[in-house]
Each structure stands twice: as structure tokens, then as C-alpha cells.
């Protein structure tokens, strides 16, 4: 059976928090941009030694608020206080000097420098040449204290994603950080690395460091946080503690309505193999082999999910299957037809639909209208084209129907696709791809960066395709998503599929070991 987070770590003692001077006070923060009220009278406090989760959908105002704290923006109204005093923060340098650190979702490290050099970068006294004397020893002390295993002499480009995150934390601690903001810190980690990170954060909290934990993973919030603040439309809509709430209540606070977090998965009779991948080998962008002897079958009426940390060959596998990347060996077949190496249009004609990982780069033409994007791959065929002329009435009827059925929020059909929200762009892509009722659907990172409401809708549509008899292959770095959707789960590491298991056999622990490259549990 699927299992949740393994351990709920001991919380730091916050019984005297009300008697403390808050480490951080955001008092009545308001920030306006042209046409947008990004923050509206926001109040937030963080105590010393507290892990404070900040939740909210895209556009809720979280990033603006944290950028104000870090000195990237100035508030139009309100005040930032540290230890009861006005912070005086006007730049990131001021924030660092004041003991505020921020670890962005995309790490801010120089790959060609060593760990010690990255830690020393920007420190007072460093000129053109970095002085790393004494840095390695201090890095070793911090690593030992907080369970952050890093080699000071290793080059950053040699490190795995989880190790790079540890470097970012060490870098903040080296600068005597007393308040650390972490933006989606578990997005690129294996379950084992998530548990290790939680231990580190709890140790930091024990030492009095305040932590602001920004994430969309509600289970992690309940497992880790001492307090939770929820934002929506630039305002704080609620503050609570894990013992007094649930995933459903938090999601409701985020979107303003009840949300179905676990999609219904009706029983479906599984049919014949519709997508067959056999012995596939594919080179990556740098010429090295990214996909190594991959084999996988997806049958009618099932969803197979591929789990794995980013950069382990998932993108190259998807692009090879749909015809966007050359194959060096192996075979791809759709309904028994060999489509290996075919042009994407021929693969599509064989019955495959594709929801790409990079929706803005590969899924839509941002400057084209909603209608133009909806007929992008079929504009030269009936009923949209006759004798070389577009049939505008047929196009409009078709597009209106898709926009309505797939709940795409757009002012008009003529609105440029790039003007839509991420969730609506993803719905637009789904509408186009599913309108042909494909036999095989490959969806890569289907809900990355979309709101809870859009993710709920996308999950429902994928399950409906399964019910229709399509073979659905979902590639996702979100393990919760893979577990919620899949009938079978494949785990990919270093270009190989290490194991394929039924959902009833899947545990977070087993998948986590496989994601980390352990074949012993395969």
C-alpha cells in the first residue's frame, strides 16, 4: 500500500513563543504593481526556532512578500521588523548582513567553482581572487552539526541536485543566517533526501534559526511546520497549526472552495498493449547516453507513471517516443506499428498525443491566438481546411466547444495564448491533444507550476482518458502525483528503468531507494 511521510520529527519548543520578541514581523505589507495589488495589508510573524510554512497558489503574493523581505522590492505600505526593530533592508546585501538568507528553487551556485569557493563568493575582503582559507574547516563543522554531507573541495558541477541544496544551506549558515527562506526546497529531492532535509531544518530550528518554508506539498507542511500561513489573492486568508487542520482544509483555504485532492479511480479492464518501448537508447544534448536500454509497455485502460529525480533521462525518453529526438538503438511501437525515428507528425497520425514538459516552449506558440493554438496540428485538414482555404466558421465552432468542455478561461478565442495563466495554457494543450481521442497519451510534468484547481482538473481528465481505453504514460517529478494517478509505477534513475511495480506494491520508501539508484530493492 502507498505510505505517507515516514517520520514526524520532534518539534522545537514554542510554548513561550507569545512571550518572545518575534524574529521577523511583516506588519501591514502592501505592494502594488501596475494593475495588480500583489500584497494587501499582509501580517506575518516568525519566532526564533520556528518553522513557518507559507502556502498559496501561483499569484497569491508569496514571492512578492519574500522579495520584500530579501530587499529586492520596497513595500508601498507597512514595515519589515527584525527582532522588534525596523530592518532597514533595501537590498539582498542588506538582508544577508541582517542575517536573512534565501534558498531559491533554482540554486544560485557557480558550477565551475568548488563548494568552498561558492561559500566564499561575495564575502567581505574577497577581491578578484577568492580567499578560501579557513572556509573548508568551517564548512566541515557546519556539515557535521547539521548533517549536511558536502566535500568543500568538490566542484559544484560534479554534485547531485540534493548535494547542491546542501551547499546552499551551508552557504547561508556560514553567513550567520538567523532567518532562512526556502522556496519549494523538496521539488527536486528523493524521498530519502527529503527526510534528511527535514532533520537538518529541525536541528537549525533547535539552534534558534527561524525558517520560512514555501511549498505546495501539503503533506510535508503537516509533517514539518510549527505554524502555517495561507495566502490567496495577495491577502492572508488563514493561520493555523498542523494539529488543528488537514490537507483538505489547507487546500480549501488556498483556493476558496473544496478540492478533491485524491482523484477517484474507477476500476477499468486493462486491454492490449498500445505503447511498447523496447531496448531504447537515446543520446542527450551533450552527446552522452541519456537513456540506456529502456523497456516499458503501457496497455489500454491503464496509467503508467514514471517517477524519478529531474535529469535522469525522462525528458530524452519522452522526446524519443514522440519523434523529437533521434534513437540510437531500440524500438517504439504504437498499436503494433513501429514508429521509431518517425517525424512527430507521423507519430501523431499513428495515435499518440503529447503534453510536453515545457508548455511555453513546446506546447503552444505564445503569440498565436487561443483558436490558432487549438488547431495548430490540424489546420490543414478537414473540417478546418478545404481546397487550401481555412473554414473560419468550423474553426470557431470547434474551438468554442473545446474551450467550454475543457474549462479554459480566456477573454476571447483571439486572445494570445501567452496571456493565459499556466493552468489555462495546460488546459488548452490538453484540449487540443485529447480532441482527436488518441490511443496513447504521453503527459510529461502535467501539473508542474499550475494551481491546485487546475491540477485537480488535469488529473480528472487523465483518468477519463484511461477510462476511455487510452494508454496513458505520465512522467512526473512529483511523487505524490505519480502515486495518486498510476496503476503501475516505473522508477527511472541514471537513464535506466530500474523497476516497474503495481500501485499496491509501491511505498515511498521503496520508490525513494530506487530513485537514489539502489537496484537492491528492484
Regions found by a protein language model. Give the residues of each.
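Glycine-rich phosphate-binding loops of nucleotide-dependent enzymes
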Residues: 16-522
